[in-house]
Amino acid sequence: MAKMQAKVQADERDDGLREKMISVNRVTKVVKGGRILGFAALTVVGDGDGRIGMGKGKAKEVPVAVQKAMEQARRNMFKVPLKNGTLQHEVHGKHGASAVLLAPAKAGTGVIAGGPMRAVFDVMGVQNVVAKSHGSTNPYNLVRATLDGLRKQSTPADIAAKRGKSVEDILG
């Protein structure tokens, strides 16, 4: 099965959402009459203010696969609580054999993350973060692991509500 990785491409549409294509793979289905070629695209969409979504599209041609992936990403968006352009706290995410460590960073640090994780943080609007991946570097699994970690983010107000305390008690 032949594989083809595309460079990460960015696009901003009129609705204010940022779109990035992470990868395009050429896939082959072998049938009695020969081979059937197709394409699978992986994309992320964000609003630059903490909302993020991931989509995967499959089709016989690349533009159709990318369009399907973008539409799915828009449907799967969720909100991540950010604090001054970075994460609230350190968090671990896992999907399959991919594991990621996501940590907040001081202002001026920038996005220190590799490959597909960088695209996720760019479209989400995170300016300062440190991220490390362990295990599998499959782009699909890395994006899913990153989103798993981002879903685990909680605000001080959430923690205070769970513990039955005030936000001031939680923050010290």
Curated annotation (Swiss-Prot):
Output a single Gene Ontology CC term carried by this record.
small ribosomal subunit
What UniProt keywords apply to this chain's record, in alphabetical order? Answer: Ribonucleoprotein, Ribosomal protein, RNA-binding, rRNA-binding
The question of whether rRNA-binding is a record keyword is answered with yes
What PANTHER family does its record include?
A: MITOCHONDRIAL RIBOSOMAL PROTEIN S5
* Pfam families named among the record's database cross-references: Ribosomal_S5 (PF00333), Ribosomal_S5_C (PF03719)
The protein's role, per its UniProt record: With S4 and S12 plays an important role in translational accuracy.
Q: Which GO terms describe its biological process?
A: translation
TM spans, by residue?
Answer: none
Q: What is this protein called?
A: Small ribosomal subunit protein uS5
| InterPro entries in alphabetical order | Ribosomal_Su5_D2-typ_SF, Ribosomal_uS5, Ribosomal_uS5_bac-type, Ribosomal_uS5_C, Ribosomal_uS5_N, Ribosomal_uS5_N_CS, Ribsml_uS5_D2-typ_fold_subgr
Top-level lineage group: Bacteria
What HAMAP family does the record tag this protein with? Ribosomal_uS5_B (MF_01307_B)
What GO molecular function terms would the record report?
rRNA binding; structural constituent of ribosome
Q: Which family does it belong to?
A: Belongs to the universal ribosomal protein uS5 family.
**Annotated ranges, domain S5 DRBM:** 17-80
Subunit info here reads:
Part of the 30S ribosomal subunit. Contacts proteins S4 and S8.
Annotated source species: Burkholderia cenocepacia (strain HI2424)
Domain commentary: The N-terminal domain interacts with the head of the 30S subunit; the C-terminal domain interacts with the body and contacts protein S4. The interaction surface between S4 and S5 is involved in control of translational fidelity.
